Amino acid sequence: MNKNTNDFEIMAPIGSRESLAAAINAGANSVYFGIGKLNMRSHSANHFTIDDLKEIAETCNAKGIQTYLTVNTVIYGEDIETMHEIIDAAKAANITAVIASDVAVMMYCRQVGVEVHLSTQLNISNIDALKFYAQFADVAVLARELNMDQVKEIHEQIIKQNICGPKGQPIRIEMFCHGAFCMAISGKCYMSLHDSNRSANRGACTQICRRSYTVTDNETGNQLEIDNKYIMSPKDLKSVRFIDKMMDAGVRVFKIEGRARGPEYVHTVVSCYKEAIESVLDGTFTEEKKDQWDERLSTVFNRGFWDGYYQGQKMGEWTKDYGNKATEKKVLIGKVIKYFSRLGVAEVAVEANTFVKGEKLLITGNSTGAMFLNAEEIRYDLNPVDKAEQGWRVSIPVPDKVRPNDKLFKLVVN
């Protein structure tokens, strides 16, 4: 493969300042986020507001990181004015691009000079559809239901037919590489609206597909035996073991799902996929590394993993349990009081739970992001101790700068 790391982009999800810092520190090339209304996670993440756009853009631009604002819900007539306000604010803040699914959003972005990327909600599955949308957008997310042979064919046709976006460059292909999978095609689900009058297509999904269900014969009242109660809850996508095939197929932007996830999720997933892409490029993409990435990815939020449809699988794989199957869970200990830069030591308040020497710790914060460390040493009143008790203030060595009021957790086997 005659490529370098600059040809590929890892796009991180952010729903909070903590996850933004985690994405930056882990080496993401771009971030995507919403600001309340008109995005597909408007009810499930700690969203930023329109007033945060300038700060986010300035923070990311200083690091050379692209910023993508999601305005990708169904748009009704009464939403047009709000949509215009959001796009105008994005332009004023120097946001890199808007992720859109409604043509009204695309047209207004083009009118005012804002770059457009196509959302997964469009379910783009063939070259003719992509050619139509190329008049609006420079980057397109292809449908998650495609396999890599189909993706490669689309990529080859982009090159052969010289299908370019408004910037005059060939359309870049973006694909989801990791995270939650919807039971409906490209997320176009109506179950939540039917059950709770909350539309998934307006960012208000209640995720009732994640519950367990029984099948009952209405005439007899008998319940039918099924092999899995979670008949509509897919496992999460994980592609790190075959990221090389995605790169070969023409995928250039690797999108991570998870705007509602914590900073430890963002940091872990971004760093694993960044390492994987670099390993493919430098010829060290080994089975041993794949196993290590698998292990690390299993420690953060997941519902079990499968390959999606990317390698030709026709049927979905469903989770066997409800909720998070991560191998580790975080337990709140307390907070950071002070950081001593010359010593590389943090003073922490032990408030909610104790911790002992050798335990795995996590520190999170708006600027710190997610910092993983081991409690190699604990000192209380300058004396070494093996256990930090509730109510104590202790000092621990940390690998980098932390800030007052950063949260301290221990990570325990789940």
Residue ranges and their predicted role:
Residues 1-26, 30-42, 56-57, 63-73, ...:
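Surface-exposed amphipathic alpha-helical tracts and adjacent flexible/coil segments at the periphery
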Residues 83-119:
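Well-ordered mid-protein domain cores that form the structural environment of catalytic cofactors
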Residues 125-130:
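Short, glycine/polar-rich helix-capping loops at beta-to-alpha or helix-loop-helix junctions
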